[in-house]
């Protein structure tokens, strides 16, 4: 289903709330906008609106196995099936770094007095 909604610019906040609350489904979504601040605000307000979210691009053509893909809300569990991101649901990620040549000076070079 494709929904296109034309709105009055003075009702932008109301329109974004309508977009975010109208549907119980959220497979993909997109916004087309030219102002960076509007893009930033809209993306933030629609964080949970769709599993895949596109900015100034068509909301189709995700390649399973190459691009994480999965819906949110009634469109799925947002697991991103077909990608390694799906594994994150089943594991507890831990990053370990080992340095084989420990530094002798623990000060950051940018903190040196000139």
Specify the residue positions occupied by each region the protein language model found:
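Conserved C-terminal structural/oligomerization subdomain of aldehyde/semialdehyde dehydrogenase
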Residues: 1-114
């Amino acid at each position: 289903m494709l929904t296109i909604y034309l709105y009055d610019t003075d009702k932008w906040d109301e329109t974004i709330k309508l977009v975010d609350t109208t549907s119980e489904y959220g497979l993909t979504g997109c916004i087309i906008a030219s102002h960076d601040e509007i893009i930033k605000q809209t993306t933030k307000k629609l964080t949970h609106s769709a599993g895949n979210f596109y900015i100034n691009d068509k909301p189709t053509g995700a390649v399973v196995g190459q691009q994480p893909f999965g819906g949110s809300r009634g469109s799925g569990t947002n697991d991103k099936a077909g990608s390694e991101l799906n594994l994150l649901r089943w594991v507890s990620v831990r990053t370990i770094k080992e340095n084989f040549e420990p530094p002798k000076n623990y000060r950051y070079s940018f903190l040196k007095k000139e």
